[in-house]
Design a protein with these regions (language model features):
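Short beta-strand scaffold segments in enzyme catalytic cores
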Residues: 1-4
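Short, flexible helix/strand-to-coil boundary loops that buttress conserved ligand/catalytic motifs
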Residues: 6-7, 54
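A short, polar/charged loop-to-alpha-helix boundary motif
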Residues: 8-25
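ATP-binding/phosphotransfer module of carbohydrate and carboxylate kinases, centering on a glycine-rich
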Residues: 20, 24-187
């Protein structure tokens, strides 16, 4: 069942603001999101977060890195995943921060909804098995569950690669077609 919310925006977990203390490196600017929030999960744990916030900072810490010579920031951000698969130190610093951000988001979710499964999606599901398992382990490490939760909860990669959004949209469309037509009135 798809939970829509009053304004149709339920489940926008990427825009939940997360604690940044200990997540950002010394002198690292506060991450901003396209939605206008500062420090939400998407400002760190997304391709846009890499392009806009993480890569520019880490390139100042890894001077003369190949990614700094790419020219197009969007293209450079897309290349970070491949560098992570090769265990490049700059890319690993970025993915460690992303794992920490997702872990903190899952911790927040654990405290308000106590789910039995936490699914990890996005570009990481399209990486090598070794990198996927490393990233999943890092997210698990940064997710603080109570003992009772840790015993029963599962942290897993989304099945069928990154189709969760498409699946949810299809279910919502089907439910809308099957719902009785509501009478509308105008003033």
């Amino acid at each position: 069942r798809v939970v829509r919310g009053a304004a149709g925006m339920a489940g926008e977990l990427g825009h939940v603001q997360i604690p940044l203390h200990g997540l950002l490196a010394e002198g690292q600017p506060l991450p901003t999101c396209n939605c206008g929030f500062v420090g939400d999960a998407e400002s760190i744990a997304s391709l846009t977060g890499i392009e806009r916030n993480l890569l520019p900072y880490w390139l100042t810490r890894f001077e003369n890195h190949e990614l700094g010579r790419v020219g197009d920031p969007k293209q450079a951000a897309k290349l970070v995943r491949g560098y992570g698969e090769r265990e490049d130190p700059l890319a690993m610093a970025i993915f460690e921060q992303q794992a920490m951000a997702i872990g903190r988001l899952f911790t927040i979710a654990a405290n308000y909804s106590d789910p039995d499964t936490y699914f990890l999606g996005g570009g990481v599901v399209e990486t090598t098995p070794t990198f996927r398992q490393w990233f999943l382990a890092r997210v698990r490490h940064h997710t603080a569950l109570r003992d009772e939760q840790a015993r029963v909860a599962t942290l897993a990669l989304v099945p069928d690669l990154d189709m969760a959004g498409a699946r949810g949209a299809a279910i919502a469309a089907l439910e809308a077609l099957q719902a009785p037509v509501r009478a509308r009135t105008s003033l």
